[in-house]
């Protein structure tokens, strides 16, 4: 989200009507776990005796607080339901306090996955963005860059209307991803048609130190102050917009999140910086990720 222009009241109300049970939907924490008979499991398998597994449809974690897919020998300590982050969004001229809470995680495990369901959902809170609200709370959805269905270059994403808000020109994708500094220069030719399409297995992204995502704020969540402002077009989110999206990088070693907000009409490279804030409550004292 950024300070720019007004999001239409009509759009917000229409989305709210279509999602009248949104609170119930997005407060449930779940992950998709493959069944024991699924023959498409990757060749590496988690050792269940060595780690606790976060069960589908529950809000419980094991004593070691390791959030693990049954099909992967990997802990996802900093990408799991219930985790909260705190930090800031800043630019040359602005600074805002930001809070993020992860509600659901549903990562793609298979190379042939074609689901368009968001891989991550949660709430995004930004404070003192507008002169009429102390804070603005939105629901965001996100997709992981898995180098197959969702590569770095969004022009190669599925041509689906639901994904249009994540789209950007090749040059914009390249200039933003390069700011993270974790890629070799050989991967960044703007003239190559297959920019960003690496020869990775779909689940390989989980075994890397850095997980890359795109986050998109979809609509406002119910809030007493925000609801009252919807009655007045002249004041509703005056000076603010969440029409753009974020390029995001999660460091699996430290849990830190770095991101950049993008919209063609906004100041470029507004930086998002977050760190986990409730690790004690979830017993996540350190990451299980190891650098090979």
Swiss-Prot record:
Listed GO CC annotations: GID complex; vacuole
One Pfam family cited in the UniProt record for this chain: Vac_ImportDeg
Source taxon at top rank: Eukaryota
GO terms (BP aspect): negative regulation of gluconeogenesis; proteasome-mediated ubiquitin-dependent protein catabolic process; protein catabolic process; protein catabolic process in the vacuole; protein targeting to vacuole; response to osmotic stress; response to starvation
Recorded family membership: Belongs to the GID4/VID24 family.
Biological role: Substrate-recognition component of the GID E3 ligase complex recruiting N termini and catalyzing ubiquitination of proteins targeted for degradation. GID E3 is regulated through assembly with interchangeable N-degron-binding substrate receptors induced by distinct environmental perturbations. Required for the adaptation to osmotic or heat stress. Required for the regulation of protein levels of the adapter protein ART2, a component of the ART-Rsp5 ubiquitin ligase pathway, part of the plasma membrane quality control.
Record note on quaternary structure: Substrate-recognition component of the GID/CTLH ubiquitin ligase complex. In the absence of stress, the complex exists as an inactive anticipatory complex (GID(Ant)), composed of VID30/GID1, the E3 ubiquitin-ligase RMD5/GID2, VID28/GID5, GID8, and the RING-like subunit FYV10/GID9, awaiting a substrate receptor to form the active E3 ligase complex. When cells are shifted to glucose-containing medium, the substrate receptor VID24/GID4 is induced and becomes part of the complex, named GID(SR4).
PANTHER family linked: GID COMPLEX SUBUNIT 4 HOMOLOG, VACUOLAR IMPORT AND DEGRADATION PROTEIN 24
Name used for this protein in its record: GID complex substrate-recognition subunit 10
Gene that specifies this protein: GID10
């Amino acid at each position: 989200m950024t300070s720019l222009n007004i999001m239409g009241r009509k759009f917000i109300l229409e989305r709210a009507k279509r999602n009248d049970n949104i609170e119930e939907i997005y407060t449930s924490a779940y992950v998709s776990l493959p069944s024991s008979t699924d023959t498409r499991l990757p060749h590496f398998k988690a050792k269940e005796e060595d780690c606790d597994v976060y069960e589908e449809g529950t809000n419980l974690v094991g004593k070691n607080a390791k959030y693990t897919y049954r099909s992967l020998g990997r802990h996802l300590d900093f990408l799991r339901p219930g985790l909260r982050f705190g930090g800031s969004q800043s630019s040359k001229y602005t600074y805002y306090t930001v809070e993020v809470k992860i509600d659901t995680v549903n990562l793609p495990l298979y190379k042939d996955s074609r689901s368009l369901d968001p891989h991550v959902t949660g709430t995004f809170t930004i404070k003192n963005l507008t002169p009429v609200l102390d804070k603005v709370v939105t629901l965001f959805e996100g997709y992981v860059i898995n180098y197959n269905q969702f590569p770095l270059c969004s022009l190669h994403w599925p041509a689906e209307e639901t994904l249009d808000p994540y789209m950007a020109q090749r040059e914009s994708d390249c200039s933003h991803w390069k700011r993270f500094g974790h890629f070799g220069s050989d991967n960044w030719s703007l003239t190559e048609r297959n920019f960003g399409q690496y020869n990775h297995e779909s689940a390989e992204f989980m075994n890397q130190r850095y997980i890359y995502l795109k986050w998109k704020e979809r609509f406002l969540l119910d809030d007493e102050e925000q609801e009252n402002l919807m009655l007045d077009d002249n004041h509703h989110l005056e000076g603010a917009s969440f029409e753009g999206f974020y390029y995001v990088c999660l460091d699996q070693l430290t849990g830190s999140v770095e991101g950049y907000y993008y919209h063609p009409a906004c100041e470029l490279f507004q930086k998002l910086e977050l760190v986990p804030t409730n690790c004690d409550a979830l017993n996540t004292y350190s990451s299980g990720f190891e650098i090979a």
